[in-house]
Amino acid sequence: MSQDVNKLSKQPTPDKAEDNAFFPSPYSLSQYTAPKTDFDGVEHKGAYKDGKWKVLMIAAEERYVLLENGKMFSTGNHPVEMLLPLHHLMEAGFDVDVATLSGYPAKLELWAMPTEDEAVISTYNKLKEKLKQPKKLADVIKNELGPDSDYLSVFIPGGHAAVVGISESEDVQQTLDWALENDRFIVTLCHGPAALLSAGLNREKSPLEGYSVCVFPDSLDEGANIEIGYLPGRLKWLVADLLTKQSLKVVNDDMTGRTLKDRKLLTGDSPLASNELGKLAVNEMLNAIQNK
């Protein structure tokens, strides 16, 4: 088996839908994707029954990340990072609304979809219509946020598409401000914490200054991800680096599936954290409801 894997190309695969754009190499996908996740069951099935509280997911609507060398990485939200945490939340009884910056369809990295994982696939099928026709985030801010909003948490999944637009959006900034001011949860993982950069947009300091976070390691995006052909070049900027410059504390430098809670900010380091982050979010949200 290892010999067969080693024969796979480490050259990124051309994406014929766009000029000079590439999917991850066959070899990198053999290392980073699998037909099943580590999902081991739902801990609180149906535990939330009142129906009021919901999750607002801010999904990526842009497919391509322009790299330093002029090539583009064909990406999107990582399906495991999006759908496995949501599986735990939805099975616990929380409804999910999907929003993108412009209201355009959410983009997923279908090449990372675990096709034999019932938890992920079933959640994808339930959300597919919302992913194709999401809400526009500005409309959500105008009509559905405020102290009496039904959203208990804001969820930003990972995938490299999170570094495009979401990290420098005034609408994301307003959403994060609302969550912080109204004691709501912010849940994100892998490259999703790029969204937290928007909190410091045009400000002397970020309201998230001093918060500790898990995030995808910059060292992998600078090294192994390029060497094995996952990325067709270097990113123009690195998530952990810029978070650190906004005085957030990045607690990991590797990818182990680590999760972290700092106040109402719940983070995970990679796709490996998806299952545990979903469990953590459910536990924290249920506890918050009991204490309201």
Curated annotation (Swiss-Prot):
Cellular compartments per GO CC: cytoplasm
GO molecular function: glyoxalase III activity; protein deglycase activity; thiolester hydrolase activity
Keywords: Cytoplasm, DNA damage, DNA repair, Hydrolase, Stress response
Main localization of the protein described in the UniProt heading: cytoplasm
Enzyme Commission code(s) on record: 3.1.2.-, 3.5.1.-, 3.5.1.124
HAMAP family xref list: Deglycase_HchA (MF_01046)
Compositional bias per record (Polar residues), positions renumbered to this chain: 1-12
Start and end residues of each stretch annotated as Disordered: 1-23
PANTHER family, sorted: PROTEIN/NUCLEIC ACID DEGLYCASE DJ-1-RELATED, PROTEIN_NUCLEIC ACID DEGLYCASE 1
Family membership: Belongs to the peptidase C56 family. HchA subfamily.
Ion transport as UniProt keyword: no
Catalyzed reactions per annotation: N(omega)-(1-hydroxy-2-oxopropyl)-L-arginyl-[protein] + H2O = lactate + L-arginyl-[protein] + H(+); N(6)-(1-hydroxy-2-oxopropyl)-L-lysyl-[protein] + H2O = lactate + L-lysyl-[protein] + H(+); S-(1-hydroxy-2-oxopropyl)-L-cysteinyl-[protein] + H2O = lactate + L-cysteinyl-[protein] + H(+); N(omega)-(1-hydroxy-2-oxoethyl)-L-arginyl-[protein] + H2O = L-arginyl-[protein] + glycolate + H(+)
Entry annotation: catalytic residues: 190
The gene coding this protein: hchA
Protein name (record): Protein/nucleic acid deglycase HchA
Protein's job: Protein and nucleotide deglycase that catalyzes the deglycation of the Maillard adducts formed between amino groups of proteins or nucleotides and reactive carbonyl groups of glyoxals. Thus, functions as a protein deglycase that repairs methylglyoxal- and glyoxal-glycated proteins, and releases repaired proteins and lactate or glycolate, respectively. Deglycates cysteine, arginine and lysine residues in proteins, and thus reactivates these proteins by reversing glycation by glyoxals.
Taxonomic source organism: Staphylococcus aureus (strain MRSA252)
Keyword DNA damage: yes
Gene Ontology biological process terms in this record: DNA repair; methylglyoxal catabolic process to D-lactate via S-lactoyl-glutathione; protein repair
Compartment(s): Cytoplasm
Pfam short name (any one): DJ-1_PfpI
